[in-house]
């Protein structure tokens, strides 16, 4: 049987259909089509300008590629599994378009540097889009924080009431996390913004190519300086998957809190109907499904990271077919992260905050216990002694069914003569929050300073 593959000259028989289907990647790498065409356009321009192929040949190939790009944008291109991948499909389509001269496009190029170039272009584009969506989410958080500087809520440790804080302070904690996520993707973009084109299969080429020219045409800031490295590593994808895993972990934590806060037991927020669903049997239900889905999708992103790490861990240099497994997880992670960022921004910007429920929650607990201990410490009592006294008072209140602010002054003064009538103001949630004006604290003045700093950061 004659083998019509572009690499078929060395073979006497063709792959069986089921084997061919197993080895094909066109079912998912079709997403690289516009980037493959971009890479080919840059490559053929370089071939023409350096005289490696004749000017009229370069012009014919360029015209054919531009027609394919128009057809792709119109949704008119059809791919064939028998052509394995996006690169061979494009070459087959180009041959149909312009004839045998299409075969000169692959001069001084391998599919190894071709696919690496495609993925660098694709990921560079997608990281830019993720950066924009992250910027939008951070702006949403800032807007919400500005509205709630003086909204008081319980702060938690171990999911137990710890100290009262400003809701804005809580939101700005996530703003900081997402800011670091933005920085990580910016570093990732730097590492992705290099051109592998011209590395060929693994050792470079005997043709006098101009790698700087193709890098410039494709908008890369530089080139890979080792041809083996250029075609054999996927650390730029691993870095993307790692950054995405950290980002979706942050999103998942925020989703967990939103899920808790909109429950009947908390009642701190209400999510918009547009981000909630109902039950097929319980008419009253309003479920935070979108938040739950983001939380759940963290697992698939983590899985893609560990999958590619496992693929890469034992690969000798240079290219191996195992690297075909680098794409599906990358594509799925891009989709998951972009949609999750959009959903999160939408949920936050449209939710309703129950300020009263948040405040009341801080008045029906012992989260002001630290205020009492600090009060005594500021009057000269060693903090450890103050801690012991307050702990016993909390135990006393717990048994009697009331709170620290309900203790009569006479009882306080039995415990310590240092306690005066001003203790009741010190125990108020708003006072407790306002006084925490240490740098980075939850005091209103500190929060307003942080908001101004964050605004300047976003404007850069």
From Swiss-Prot:
Coiled coil: none annotated. Pfam families: ASL_C2, Lyase_1. GO terms for biological process: arginine biosynthetic process via ornithine; L-arginine biosynthetic process. Pathway: Amino-acid biosynthesis; L-arginine biosynthesis; L-arginine from L-ornithine and carbamoyl phosphate: step 3/3. Its EC number is 4.3.2.1. One of its GO terms (molecular function) is argininosuccinate lyase activity. Belongs to the lyase 1 family. Argininosuccinate lyase subfamily. This is Argininosuccinate lyase. It comes from Streptococcus sanguinis (strain SK36). The gene is argH.
């Amino acid at each position: 049987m004659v083998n019509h593959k572009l690499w078929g000259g060395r073979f006497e028989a063709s792959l069986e259909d089921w084997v061919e289907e197993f080895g094909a990647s066109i079912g998912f790498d079709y997403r690289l089509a516009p980037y493959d065409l971009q890479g080919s356009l840059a490559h053929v321009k370089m071939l023409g300008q350096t005289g490696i192929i004749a000017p009229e040949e370069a012009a014919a190939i360029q015209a054919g590629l531009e027609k394919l790009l128009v057809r792709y944008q119109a949704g008119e291109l059809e791919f064939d599994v028998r052509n394995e991948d996006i690169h061979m499909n494009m070459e087959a389509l180009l041959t149909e378009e312009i004839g045998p001269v299409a075969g000169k496009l692959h001069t001084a190029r391998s599919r190894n540097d071709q696919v690496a170039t495609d993925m660098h272009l694709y990921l560079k584009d997608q990281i830019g889009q993720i950066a924009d969506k992250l910027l939008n989410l951070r702006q949403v958080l800032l807007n919400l924080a500005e509205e709630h500087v003086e909204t008081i809520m319980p702060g938690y440790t171990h999911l137990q009431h710890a100290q009262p804080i400003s809701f804005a302070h809580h939101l700005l904690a996530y703003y900081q996390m997402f800011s670091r996520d933005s920085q990580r993707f910016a570093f990732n973009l730097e590492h992705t913004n290099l051109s592998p084109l011209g590395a060929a299969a693994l050792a470079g080429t005997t043709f006098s190519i101009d790698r700087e020219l193709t890098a410039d045409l494709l908008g890369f800031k530089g080139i890979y300086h080792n041809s083996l490295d250029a075609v054999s590593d996927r650390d730029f994808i691993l870095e993307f998957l790692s950054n995405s895993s950290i980002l979706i972990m942050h999103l998942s934590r925020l989703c967990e809190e939103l899920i808790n806060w909109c429950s009947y037991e908390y009642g701190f927020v209400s999510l918009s109907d547009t981000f909630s669903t109902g039950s097929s049997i319980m008419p009253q239900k309003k479920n935070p499904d979108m938040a739950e889905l983001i939380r759940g999708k963290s697992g698939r992103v983590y899985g893609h990271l560990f999958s590619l790490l496992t693929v890469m861990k034992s690969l000798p240099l240079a290219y191996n077919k195992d690297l075909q497994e680098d794409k599906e997880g990358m594509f799925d992670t891009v989709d998951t992260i972009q949609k999750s960022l959009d959903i999160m921004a939408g949920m936050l910007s449209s939710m309703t905050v129950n300020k009263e429920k948040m405040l009341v929650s801080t008045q029906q607990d012992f989260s002001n216990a630290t205020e009492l201990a600090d009060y005594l410490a500021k009057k000269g009592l060693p903090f450890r002694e103050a801690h012991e006294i307050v702990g016993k008072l909390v135990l006393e209140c717990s048994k009697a069914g009331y709170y620290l602010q309900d203790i009569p002054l006479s009882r306080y003064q039995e415990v310590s003569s240092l306690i005066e009538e001003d203790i009741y103001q010190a125990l108020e949630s708003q006072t407790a929050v306002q006084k925490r004006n240490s740098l980075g604290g939850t005091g209103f003045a500190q929060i307003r300073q942080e908001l101004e700093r964050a605004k300047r950061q976003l404007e850069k």
